[in-house]
Amino acid sequence: GMLAKYLLNEEKPNDLKSMVRRYLPEYGDYEKQDKFDKIPWDKKELDPLCHYGCQDTDYTLRLMLFFEKKLIDLGLYNTYRNLIMTASRVLTSVEKNGLYVDRAFNQELLDSYLPKIEAAKEAIYNLPKVKKFTKLYNQSKIEKYIAKLEEEIENLDPRVDKRKIQSREQKIANIRAGVFTTKKELELIRPVSLGSSVDLPQLMYSEEGFNFEVIKKNDSGKPSTDEETLTNLRLTVKKPDSPKAVFLDSLLELRGLEKMYKTYIEGWHEKTQDDDRLHGRFLIHGTTSGRLSSAEPNAQQIPKTSVDPNIKKQLVAPKGTLYIASDFSQAELRIMAHLSGDETYLNAFNSGQDPHLAIAATKYHVPYEEALKIYEDENHPDHKIWKVRRKQAKQIAFGLIYGIGNKLLAVKLSDPKAGIIVTPEEAQKEMDIFFGQHPKLKTFLKKQEKFLRKNGYLVSLFGRKRRLPQIYSSDRGEEAYALRLALNFPCQSAASDMCLFGSILIYYLMRQGKLPPTKSVCLVHDANYQITKPENINTWSIYEMWQIYRNPLTKPYFGFQIDDVTMAMDFVIGRSMAEELPFIPGYDYRKMLEPDFSVEG
């Protein structure tokens, strides 16, 4: 019932009681069960417990019958049956299989990361500006503390409170002599707390500190110190080696280390169960876009190997098995090319060109082969220029797909450490140039906007609907948000569902014995991580999976088939999630489990 309701209306809540209240109002007395819910299970009486269970079952069935009719009437039943329900079974299997954790290596990281964090803090404390501020800041705290003690002395009666007066006078003398003994006194001379909502804003925004401009405030009205603010402030600093730039770079690095430790090292240590596995939750109904989401852990946000290989290295294949990771490449762009009919992207994808480099070459009126030659030659004087051009073409394309505005695109296009700062106005100009180069994409967007304004929702290739009442809002910001999703939703949703449906087909073919046995342990919107015995990894099995993923047979189930571009899929093999060795046809993967195996060999 919950999944049916999600397909009918992707907005929350999706829990049973909320759905009964909304769709079965004649059973309003069900709300009285809220009090019963608060009683611990071992304290509930049997008779009301049986009645409660029967009500749950009855209302679940009534809701399902109600939703089923709605799904049929709205033409969503095929999507529900062939995608949502089958995906639910597959994801239940993924959750049960779990991600195997190398506990010994996890413990190594627990021991080694804290010194890294402390070293990063120490580097910030040793910055001249921070040292100077800390001295002034602590002196100010000391003076306030002494003033408080002196005020207390004045309010004491010398005839009655002689010992109290002497005690406070001694404290003042000790502090002025640089002797701090109590916990409260030691707080007066500690380093600035880089995680404090009091200390850090003072360091960043006061005249005694770095005196940054306040560009954002938090909910309590105080200057913000969140990651987005730090990143945007960094874009305002032109010189990469200036004190402000060094401070912001160092603080962002510290935040990254702390997040890695708390989420992926300490967090996984606490969540790993007795079977040495992380059994996360994979949710079909967790996003409004239709993309898969996950929690405990959030598989979508596991850092890439290039960021820190040690994080994925904790996730190993169980003894006697290997990872097969099947990873979609540029799926959203391929869907965008199909939906819009954009020849530049279609030609690049179908000819095997690098699409981002092809777009950059078109923009700068350089033949693709010449641009590719420069891009691949690290010794060419223009190599770095073309690296930046390709990266910016990629950021613009994905920025449009992800529905970001010119401010966030400016952040994406900038590289402060390399001295590249892009303003929102410049980012907007780049977006306009991009649309000028891709008129069919602009035409597709106008069609989407027209449909959205008429109907109040968008529809994906797989039949999902995204309801956007914001399109009718008098608030221009809300209307702009809905318009950005006119490209974002159909591309993101269909790309995720292509991966999901391909994974469903592989799961059922494997269960029917038509593919070698594998266990999917992690499924995200653009990748499927499976474990299997090495003898199951061969040219035939990989080719069969590749054929399914590149163009799953969608016509019989959803009424469409993409015929002008195929999906691109990379297969990598490894003993852990961090080891990403490209599949080699004909290789005997049993060798990877031999004690003397090395990647270099």
Regions found by a protein language model. Name each.
Residues 1-601:
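Conserved catalytic core of nucleotide polymerization and phosphodiester-bond processing enzymes
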